[in-house]
């Protein structure tokens, strides 16, 4: 199995594993393996103005929804989670692609293991 297919299977597997969390949480959530392999719940897609979770997952630039000044903080938190296994809690401003409105959020990012790989899970709450 090539890497692309393997990563597709991994994201499908963790989506199933986390299905109840994604569906029942009051928070906007996304799970990230890499730029091409990610999944979110409907609340996250709605927060950013996407028509569906699939539309967000198909977007190529994962940081394009984050205000430029906050992007480095998100990158640092991701690095801590994916490489050091350290969770972070940071303030992040995101942009709704439909309205261009800036939304202030608190993001909790934590590492999660699945099938021998480290994913990052991002929980967002408006502030």
What are these model-derived regions, one by one?
Residues 1, 106-126:
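Short loop/turn elements at sensory-signaling interfaces that couple input to output
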Residues 27, 90-91, 108:
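Short loop/turn microsegments at loop-to-beta-strand junctions
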Residues 1-16, 125-127:
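PAS-associated C-terminal cap
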Residues 38, 45-64, 71-72:
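PAS and related sensory helical modules
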Residues 33, 40-42:
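PAS-family and closely related small sensory beta-sandwich domains used
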Residues 69-93:
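Terminal output helix/cap of sensory domains in signal transduction proteins
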Residues 9-34:
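PAS/LOV and related PAS-like sensory modules
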Residues 93-100:
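PAS-family sensory domains
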């Amino acid at each position: 199995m090539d890497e692309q297919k393997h990563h597709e299977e991994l994201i499908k597997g963790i989506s199933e594993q986390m299905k109840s969390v994604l569906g029942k949480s009051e928070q906007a959530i996304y799970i990230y393996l890499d730029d091409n392999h990610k999944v979110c719940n409907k609340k996250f897609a709605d927060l950013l103005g996407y028509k569906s979770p699939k539309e967000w997952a198909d977007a190529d630039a994962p940081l394009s929804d984050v205000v430029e000044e906050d992007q480095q903080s998100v990158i640092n938190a991701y690095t801590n989670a994916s490489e050091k296994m350290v969770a972070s809690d940071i303030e992040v401003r995101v942009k709704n692609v439909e309205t261009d409105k800036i939304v202030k959020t608190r993001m909790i990012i934590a590492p999660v293991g699945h099938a021998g790989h480290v994913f990052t899970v991002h929980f967002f709450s408006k502030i």
